[in-house]
Amino acid sequence: TQLISVEPSYPYAAGRIFYLQTHICDWKDYHATVAFLRQGIAQQQAVISPFEFFNVPASPHEQLMCAESYVLKNYPAQSTPLWNGEIYQHAKIKIAYISADFYNHATSILMIELFEQHDRSQFEIIALAFNSKNDEMTVRVKAAFDRYIDVSQYTDLQVAQLIKSLQIDIAVDLKGHTQDARLGIFAYKAAPIQVNYLGQASTIGASYIDYILADRHIVPPQYHTDFSEKVVCLPHTYYVNDSKRPISSQVFSRGELGLPESGFVFCCFNNSYKISPTMFDVWMRLLQQVPNSVLWLLEGNAT
């Protein structure tokens, strides 16, 4: 807030403040701030990043405008791409999965069995990890790949050069604009095909990302034009999961969880920044209409 008072146009500060306020459900001036941010996006101003704008009530086209403007200002396509149209003569298609989340993180928890189930007779799969965290999930991830390369100390250009030297056919970005993302790697266009998958189920807004893997639920056909990528819809759902993940046998009582012994329990275990005042208003009216009901929320922070 002090920064805004000194330099009102400081890049992305307004969006960051809004994002932090939503983490603690501080909805003071919420609608006025939303209007300000949407106006800024319409005028191609650097008011909010795509990830933070994702939770602003806005149209898919506005999301695209925000992403494209952000990428153009921060991660523009390099003037000379590293891949120049070469056709690799591989016996197997080489796929590189690129992420900071090859540890006990939602991405690996969901994707681990996909890595393990790749048809090795047709594909060679390589992990490029730009986070050096290691845990029991990392051990399983490493075993699932043909090659696992720690690139946490590499620059974006060095990672891109590695992709080119490995003759990767398909580079899959598992981060998008989320935390620890390194979109600058893909700006060098080191692979013939570059794909947006899982980490961010919205457009990256970059001309050098060719496809997004989605489904008809998260990207209905009428919104395909609001993506800079070509939308590839998987059947049923784009979501993967791990069938080997054990399900706990422990059964909790309502009392152990701090819930009343009777009455309907409404639940939302999303992070608090995803809750809007409009949504919360609906919940409150539901509680009024359902006698003895309660709302169970995830406590993301003590505030």
Report residues per predicted region.
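Alpha-helical solenoid repeat scaffolds of the TPR/TPR-like class and their adjacent stem/linker regions
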Residues: 1-259, 271, 281
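A conserved nucleotide-sugar
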Residues: 122-124, 284-303
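Conserved short loop/turn motifs at secondary-structure junctions
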Residues: 20, 271-272, 297-302
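Substrate-binding clefts and catalytic carboxylate motifs of secreted carbohydrate-active enzymes
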Residues: 267-278, 285-288
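Residues that mark the start of a beta-strand
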Residues: 92-96, 263-265, 294
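A generic structural signal for short coil/turn motifs at secondary-structure boundaries
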Residues: 104-106, 274-276, 298
